[in-house]
Amino acid sequence: MPPEPTRGRFHLYDISRTISPTLAVWPGDTSFSFDYTLRTEEGASVNLTTLTLSPHTGSHADAPYHITADGAHPAALPLERYIGPAHVVTIDRQHGGIVPDDFAGRDLTGLERLLIHTWVSDLPEDRWPDDFPYPTVD
Protein backbone atom coordinates (compact mmCIF):
# COMPACT_ATOMS: atom_id res chain seq x y z
CA MET A 1 0.00 0.00 0.00
CA PRO A 2 1.51 3.36 -0.98
CA PRO A 3 2.05 5.97 1.70
CA GLU A 4 -0.59 8.64 2.13
CA PRO A 5 0.09 12.08 0.63
CA THR A 6 1.76 14.49 3.04
CA ARG A 7 0.73 18.15 2.84
CA GLY A 8 -0.31 17.82 -0.79
CA ARG A 9 2.76 15.85 -1.78
CA PHE A 10 2.97 12.23 -2.83
CA HIS A 11 5.68 9.72 -2.13
CA LEU A 12 8.23 9.31 -4.89
CA TYR A 13 9.27 5.72 -5.59
CA ASP A 14 12.71 5.03 -7.03
CA ILE A 15 12.25 2.07 -9.37
CA SER A 16 15.72 2.24 -10.88
CA ARG A 17 18.33 -0.49 -10.71
CA THR A 18 21.66 0.37 -9.14
CA ILE A 19 24.25 1.08 -11.80
CA SER A 20 27.50 -0.81 -11.24
CA PRO A 21 30.22 -2.50 -13.33
CA THR A 22 28.48 -5.85 -12.73
CA LEU A 23 25.07 -4.72 -14.02
CA ALA A 24 24.14 -6.85 -17.03
CA VAL A 25 23.70 -5.03 -20.33
CA TRP A 26 22.28 -5.98 -23.71
CA PRO A 27 24.78 -8.39 -25.33
CA GLY A 28 27.40 -6.34 -27.17
CA ASP A 29 26.44 -3.06 -25.47
CA THR A 30 28.86 -0.96 -23.40
CA SER A 31 29.14 -1.90 -19.72
CA PHE A 32 29.26 0.75 -17.01
CA SER A 33 32.66 1.92 -15.80
CA PHE A 34 33.75 4.65 -13.39
CA ASP A 35 37.32 5.89 -13.09
CA TYR A 36 39.03 8.78 -11.34
CA THR A 37 41.01 11.10 -13.58
CA LEU A 38 42.15 13.32 -10.68
CA ARG A 39 42.05 12.69 -6.92
CA THR A 40 42.57 15.12 -4.06
CA GLU A 41 44.25 12.38 -2.03
CA GLU A 42 46.88 12.20 -4.75
CA GLY A 43 47.54 15.94 -4.63
CA ALA A 44 44.98 17.26 -7.13
CA SER A 45 42.92 20.32 -6.21
CA VAL A 46 39.66 18.52 -7.08
CA ASN A 47 38.28 15.04 -7.66
CA LEU A 48 37.36 14.38 -11.29
CA THR A 49 35.83 11.22 -12.69
CA THR A 50 35.01 9.63 -16.01
CA LEU A 51 31.79 7.69 -16.53
CA THR A 52 31.28 5.31 -19.44
CA LEU A 53 27.89 3.77 -20.09
CA SER A 54 25.28 3.14 -22.73
CA PRO A 55 22.03 5.12 -22.60
CA HIS A 56 20.42 1.70 -22.19
CA THR A 57 22.22 0.94 -18.93
CA GLY A 58 19.94 -0.05 -16.06
CA SER A 59 16.43 1.35 -15.74
CA HIS A 60 15.53 3.55 -18.67
CA ALA A 61 12.78 4.49 -21.09
CA ASP A 62 13.37 3.97 -24.79
CA ALA A 63 12.31 6.73 -27.15
CA PRO A 64 10.51 5.71 -30.36
CA TYR A 65 13.76 6.38 -32.25
CA HIS A 66 15.27 3.32 -30.55
CA ILE A 67 13.28 1.04 -32.84
CA THR A 68 12.48 3.17 -35.88
CA ALA A 69 14.55 5.75 -37.79
CA ASP A 70 11.66 8.21 -38.05
CA GLY A 71 10.70 7.96 -34.36
CA ALA A 72 11.04 10.79 -31.86
CA HIS A 73 14.46 11.27 -30.26
CA PRO A 74 14.74 11.25 -26.45
CA ALA A 75 15.38 15.01 -26.30
CA ALA A 76 12.05 15.60 -28.06
CA LEU A 77 10.06 13.88 -25.32
CA PRO A 78 8.84 16.09 -22.46
CA LEU A 79 10.08 15.05 -19.00
CA GLU A 80 6.57 15.60 -17.62
CA ARG A 81 5.56 12.43 -19.44
CA TYR A 82 7.65 10.45 -16.95
CA ILE A 83 6.69 12.20 -13.72
CA GLY A 84 3.39 11.73 -11.91
CA PRO A 85 0.97 9.15 -10.62
CA ALA A 86 1.25 5.76 -12.28
CA HIS A 87 -0.63 2.48 -12.19
CA VAL A 88 1.46 -0.69 -11.74
CA VAL A 89 0.49 -4.00 -13.31
CA THR A 90 2.46 -7.14 -12.42
CA ILE A 91 2.83 -9.78 -15.11
CA ASP A 92 4.25 -13.01 -13.71
CA ARG A 93 4.52 -15.02 -16.93
CA GLN A 94 8.18 -15.57 -17.76
CA HIS A 95 8.16 -16.08 -21.52
CA GLY A 96 6.88 -14.28 -24.58
CA GLY A 97 5.53 -10.85 -25.26
CA ILE A 98 3.13 -8.76 -23.23
CA VAL A 99 -0.29 -9.14 -24.86
CA PRO A 100 -3.71 -7.54 -24.31
CA ASP A 101 -4.88 -10.62 -22.35
CA ASP A 102 -2.30 -9.74 -19.68
CA PHE A 103 -4.51 -6.76 -18.81
CA ALA A 104 -7.85 -8.60 -18.88
CA GLY A 105 -10.13 -7.65 -16.00
CA ARG A 106 -8.16 -4.49 -15.19
CA ASP A 107 -9.66 -1.05 -15.60
CA LEU A 108 -6.96 1.00 -17.31
CA THR A 109 -9.18 3.79 -18.61
CA GLY A 110 -7.93 7.31 -18.10
CA LEU A 111 -4.40 6.30 -17.10
CA GLU A 112 -1.60 8.66 -18.03
CA ARG A 113 1.18 6.29 -16.94
CA LEU A 114 1.34 2.52 -16.78
CA LEU A 115 4.31 0.69 -15.27
CA ILE A 116 4.60 -3.01 -16.00
CA HIS A 117 6.40 -5.00 -13.32
CA THR A 118 7.82 -8.27 -14.65
CA TRP A 119 9.98 -11.10 -13.42
CA VAL A 120 13.08 -9.41 -14.92
CA SER A 121 13.09 -6.99 -11.96
CA ASP A 122 13.75 -9.94 -9.66
CA LEU A 123 16.85 -11.22 -11.51
CA PRO A 124 20.29 -10.72 -9.98
CA GLU A 125 21.87 -7.56 -11.41
CA ASP A 126 24.59 -9.49 -13.23
CA ARG A 127 22.21 -11.79 -15.15
CA TRP A 128 20.84 -10.84 -18.55
CA PRO A 129 17.58 -12.67 -19.34
CA ASP A 130 17.59 -15.07 -22.28
CA ASP A 131 13.94 -14.23 -22.95
CA PHE A 132 12.53 -10.95 -21.72
CA PRO A 133 9.09 -9.35 -21.76
CA TYR A 134 8.27 -6.95 -24.57
CA PRO A 135 5.07 -5.29 -25.79
CA THR A 136 3.60 -7.04 -28.81
CA VAL A 137 2.06 -5.25 -31.78
CA ASP A 138 -1.40 -6.21 -30.50
Protein language model annotation of sequence segments:
Residues 1-138:
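Active-/binding-site microenvironments in catalytic and ligand-binding cores
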